[in-house]
UniProtKB/Swiss-Prot annotation:
Name this protein carries in UniProt: ATP-dependent Clp protease proteolytic subunit 1
Signal peptide limits: none
Catalysis performed (reactions): Hydrolysis of proteins to small peptides in the presence of ATP and magnesium. alpha-casein is the usual test substrate. In the absence of ATP, only oligopeptides shorter than five residues are hydrolyzed (such as succinyl-Leu-Tyr-|-NHMec, and Leu-Tyr-Leu-|-Tyr-Trp, in which cleavage of the -Tyr-|-Leu- and -Tyr-|-Trp bonds also occurs)
Compartment(s): Cytoplasm
CDD domains per UniProt: S14_ClpP_2
PANTHER family: ATP-DEPENDENT CLP PROTEASE PROTEOLYTIC SUBUNIT
One example of a Gene Ontology biological process annotation: protein quality control for misfolded or incompletely synthesized proteins
Species in which this protein is naturally found: Rhodopirellula baltica (strain DSM 10527 / NCIMB 13988 / SH1)
Keywords associated with the record: Cytoplasm, Hydrolase, Protease, Serine protease
Organism domain of life: Bacteria
Active site: 124 (nucleophile), 149
One Pfam family in the UniProt entry: CLP_protease
GO molecular function, one term: ATP-dependent peptidase activity
Family, as annotated: Belongs to the peptidase S14 family.
Length: 227
């Protein structure tokens, strides 16, 4: 017999049905979210996946195109989180001085620390980027090497043009020596003397010279691990 007054409260049976419907809806939403995440990961490139983990990998010669790309990645990662570390992995023989300095200046401008890692080699301008990482967060892998030297340039033309280009190369040489000196603690005079010719250092020598803070023998600790 039905209730002639019509109770305003749902019966226990109705409550159970509502709970089951809610659980089924939550399950469908969770499955949909999981599928969307899976589809997104399938569409992401390896570079995208690294960037999602705040990792930037610089490989090959440094030139304007890849320097601009690295600068954009650094700026993007800062916009995502102004405090969390960026991890810059370097395997490069160096390249354009101006392209190198574009990356270096951006690294110094960021509010978030940039940890640097030498993987294979960091030579010429790439060594400047390795050295320019956040203090205490510059690393060499055990079998990597670092090489520094004065800027190279080949010019031709009228004598006046050659003189102009030579003066510019000397200016860059002095600027790079000052940058290296400021990060490793050696005098500018010592840097100029050591880099007059190709100056190679293995990982341990790079640490002793003050170019990096330590050798990386295991997986870098995340900020969550440190907390």
């Amino acid at each position: 017999m039905s209730d002639p007054f019509g109770s305003p409260f749902p019966s226990l049976h109705d409550q159970n049905l509502n709970a089951q419907h809610a659980m089924a809806s939550d399950h469908r939403l969770a499955n949909a979210a999981s599928y969307q995440s899976y589809q997104r990961q399938r569409q992401m490139t390896l570079g995208d996946l690294l960037l999602e983990n705040r990792i930037v990998f610089m490989q090959g010669e440094i030139h304007y195109a890849n320097a601009n790309e690295i600068v954009m990645k650094l700026l993007y990662l800062q916009s995502e989180n102004r405090r969390k570390d960026i991890h810059l992995y370097i395997n490069s023989p160096g390249g354009s001085v101006t392209a190198t300095l574009a990356i270096y200046d951006t690294m110094q401008m960021l509010s978030c620390p940039v940890a640097t890692y030498c993987v294979g080699e960091a030579c010429s301008g790439a060594a400047v980027l390795l050295i320019g990482g956040a203090k205490g967060k510059r690393f060499c892998l055990p079998n990597s090497r670092v090489m520094m030297h004065q800027p190279l340039g080949g010019v031709s033309g009228q004598v006046s043009d050659i003189e102009i280009q030579a003066a510019e190369m000397f200016r860059y040489r002095d600027k790079l020596n000052e940058i290296i000196s400021s990060h490793c603690g050696k005098s500018v005079e010592q840097i100029a003397k050591d880099t007059d010719r190709d100056f190679f250092l293995d990982a341990q020598q790079a640490k002793e010279y003050g170019l990096v803070d330590d050798l990386l023998l295991g997986t870098p600790a995340s900020e969550e691990d440190e907390d």
